[in-house]
Amino acid sequence: VAVGRDNRPSGAALRDALVKGLTESGVDVVDVGVVPTPLLYWSLHHVNVVGGIQITGSHNPPEYNGFKCCVGTGSLHGEGIQRLRQIIEAGQFRSGSGNTREEAII
C-alpha cells in the first residue's frame, strides 16, 4: 500500500500510526513521502502496490486531517468504506509482519 501525506503538522504522527497498524497487520507499505494527493493517485499506477492512503485534510482548515483511501486504482467509498469502518470499530485486525520502504516519486 502506498502512503503519502500533505504537510499539515499532524501528518507525520498520523503516518507513523498508520504505518504501524498496517505493518502489524501484515501489509507492506511504500512511503511516498510528502506529496499532493494527485501524486499519491499517480503512484497507484506506477508503483507496485495494491492500493494507497493519502493523509490529508484536503480543503479543510489546517487543524483537520484524515485519510483518503484507495483500493487498486480507485477510491474506497460506499459499502467498501463502511466495511472498513466496521472492521475498525470491531477491532477485527489481521496479525502479521509487513515491511516498509520509502520511494521518492518526485
Predicted regions mapped to residue ranges:
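Ferredoxin-reductase
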Residues: 1-72
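Gly/Ser/Thr-enriched, mixed-charge loops and adjacent short helices
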Residues: 65-106
